Amino acid sequence: CVPLTLDGEAPHDAVVESEQQRQLLVGSDSYFVVRASGQVIELLSDYARVIVNMPMFAVEALGWVIEFLKQFNSRTCQVVLGAGAMRSAGLKNITARHLAIAAQSLSLMMALVPSLRELLKRHLKTTQFVLLSDFDKLQNDFREHQYEIHAKLVSIMGDRVQVHSKALANTDVNKCDGHLQPIQDLVRETGTLFRVVTQFLQPAVVQTISTRVFTDIDMRMSHAITAVDVRTLDAHKLLISDVELLNEKMHAIDASW
């Protein structure tokens, strides 16, 4: 089981500024670039030079590029979903930020593949075009891996929602004189997750994740609120106040809430 948490995803301003300087524009889309992705791009550039300067090796270069990107995809999966980074980098756990950056790195590779394909196509014989279908298979592999990472992000938050909804259902609100901690914790952790995914993932992906997470929050918290034993007017006011806070914070993240 891979330890997955929301910890450590809200970087300080200096870190944010540094990360903004590590963006790569591909077409009209901007991608965050980690060191590993930068090294991959350098190696792909070397392959491109080989293809242009020695077109007689285009078929071989195609195979090298495909195999190289397959290894990148596989290694990314092992490091993040397989928790390889915990062993190689000494991390205590894999955070939502690690997952989001991994997904972004895959998006960058997917954005570069069409250009690589066109470059190779210009240096292949017509009878060799069938080899280009390997790029389609590669893109599908990248996409499937991305879906797994997105699902893991949803799973992280789903686990936290379950914890907080159970805690709320078991809270004696009649003895509380302040905010309900389960709701406070849920608001904080949801905000943390979406600060991360908004920073590193495309808007369409963020929307997909938010829809799934908010559906889970709505269902579980509704059941938990119904289960709360309210016996005093103050307890009722407290519960209503915190539910309104939850709605306000969720709406701030996604206006469709």
Residue ranges with predicted function:
Residues 1-175, 193-205, 209, 213, ...:
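Extended alpha-helical solenoid scaffold regions that build the rod-like backbones
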Residues 211-216, 220, 233-257:
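Alpha-helical bundle/repeat cores within regulatory domains of eukaryotic proteins
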